[in-house]
Amino acid sequence: MKSRIPTLLFVLAISFSTTGFSQDDDATSKSNLQTYTPSKLLNRGQWDINWFHNLSTEPKFADGNGKSISKARENYFTSTVEAFTGISDNNRFNIGVIVEMRSNTNNDRKALSVFEFDGDKNTARSGITSFAPTIKFQPFKNIGNFSIQTAFHIPLVKNETENGVYLDQTAWTLQNRFFYDYSFENKDWQLFAELNTEYNFGDDTSFANNTFVFSPGIFLSYFPNSDFTILGLAQHSQRFGDFTQDYTALGFGAKYQISNILNLETIYTNFVRGTDNGLGQTFNIGLRALF
């Protein structure tokens, strides 16, 4: 799939807070799942590290008319590390970095072939493909459940495709993500929304060059207890500019707080439709450390 969006969206640590939870509230009475949402920023000196794995396998392709066509299976694995720390006394500004490693295979190889790293130059490629210095901030002092994350993705890939095997885009990316969460009155059901926007530029040979991405997503979560949550999600992504494509994905997942520091997350998604985009499934698992 020639798209950065599936990985970046599902890297999201999908945990939710209570309505109107401010940056200065005492979080000790709640689990990290409930307190530290993507909208919530860190205290000074606090660290949030996410290690997330995304496997996308595509046996079909949606053409320019949205018609689903069978193809030789393609597989895309992305391992992403995100590290953030708080640097402000008012809990409104964080800095961080995002690093991505990819392993892709094609030519109808099995989905798990991405873990073989066999170096078959005609069907496989792998490597560290990008890193992104990142800032995250709370623009409105009195709205603690809304934040913005800005990342500048710097490609480390020289050629997007070699011997017919795609690895990652060579265009640079300026990305802005807007996070908002809301908790219903009974506090068992919570809603999270994200709007992801991108501008891709800097390499005329890249499929993504001079394109914009607009990608909203919504997640509904239920908490049987404070240490466990199940969720459903819906996402749409639209790319426009010199190259156009779009897709819609639906999915579900769960998250469990293993300890005061560690959270475990798993998500499944299915690309139910698209235009000029691969169709298939993603399997995601992640580990988050907060200290």
Q: What are the residue ranges of the model-derived segments?
A:
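Transmembrane beta-barrel domains of Gram-negative outer membranes and organellar outer membranes
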Residues: Q23-N200, T211-L290
